[in-house]
Amino acid sequence: MSNVDHAEIAKFEALAHRWWDRESEFKPLHDINPLRVNWIDERVGLAGKKVLDVGCGGGILSEAMAQRGATVTGIDMGEAPLAVAQLHQLESGVNVEYRQITAEALAEEMPEQFDVVTCLEMLEHVPDPSSVIRACFRMVKPGGQVFFSTINRNPKAYLFAIIGAEYIMKLLPRGTHDFKKFIRPSELGAWSRSAGLTVKDIIGLTYNPLTKHYKLAPDVDVNYMIQTLREE
């Protein structure tokens, strides 16, 4: 069975034309992107690296990593977001190879081909996150690194990521997230280790509704990102 949730894909298909509008539903992704790219770049040195972006959507992260000097491939199962990504790179002049394929299928085709794999804000949108994590392990070279980000599953995350973000501040459309699909750091760590990855670091991403600014912080109660390594 394919590890694809067609209802999840449909959500983002409907919004795809606004992906690069910084005042749209995708404003949070634009706002947090520099923080995440910097965090990744500090740990791997993106320049000259061959990078795979799993669940690339409209290409916000993919383009940013390419601008840092990486050779980037972005994959997604959403046809409309990929079309937007391909159009936008014509405007921006950034070169990214985009493909409509699952991580699992690409792992069969391109094992151990990438220095770095990123999979950000994607695991909470698939039926079996552990399957994606195993595919990421297969695609990264020995000695390479894989980065994941997702949302913690606890009452605070429900309050901030769903009630706050979707209903009160309206940062995201209602129904963007399903609380049951949120992932605790302990679960993400266990799935990563089971796949063969070593967890190296974890960082939280916090939002101040008064200043409307995001920052990286030790608080992993809501949004967080982990760095993992495939040992040589």
UniProtKB/Swiss-Prot annotation:
Binding sites annotated in the UniProt record for S-adenosyl-L-methionine: 36, 55, 76, 120
Alphabetized UniProt keyword annotations: Methyltransferase, S-adenosyl-L-methionine, Transferase, Ubiquinone biosynthesis
CDD domains: AdoMet_MTases
EC number: 2.1.1.222, 2.1.1.64
The keyword Coiled coil belongs to this UniProt entry's keyword annotation: no
One Pfam family named in its UniProt record: Methyltransf_23
Catalyzed reaction equations: a 3-demethylubiquinol + S-adenosyl-L-methionine = a ubiquinol + S-adenosyl-L-homocysteine + H(+); a 3-(all-trans-polyprenyl)benzene-1,2-diol + S-adenosyl-L-methionine = a 2-methoxy-6-(all-trans-polyprenyl)phenol + S-adenosyl-L-homocysteine + H(+)
One Gene Ontology term of the molecular function aspect: 3-demethylubiquinol 3-O-methyltransferase activity
InterPro entries: SAM-dependent_MTases_sf (IPR029063), UbiG_MeTrfase (IPR010233)
Pathway(s) served: Cofactor biosynthesis; ubiquinone biosynthesis
Biological process per Gene Ontology, one example term: methylation
Family: Belongs to the methyltransferase superfamily. UbiG/COQ3 family.
PANTHER family: METHYLTRANSFERASE (PTHR43464), UBIQUINONE BIOSYNTHESIS O-METHYLTRANSFERASE, MITOCHONDRIAL (PTHR43464:SF19)
Function of the protein: O-methyltransferase that catalyzes the 2 O-methylation steps in the ubiquinone biosynthetic pathway.
Name of the protein in its database record: Ubiquinone biosynthesis O-methyltransferase
Recorded name of the encoding gene: ubiG
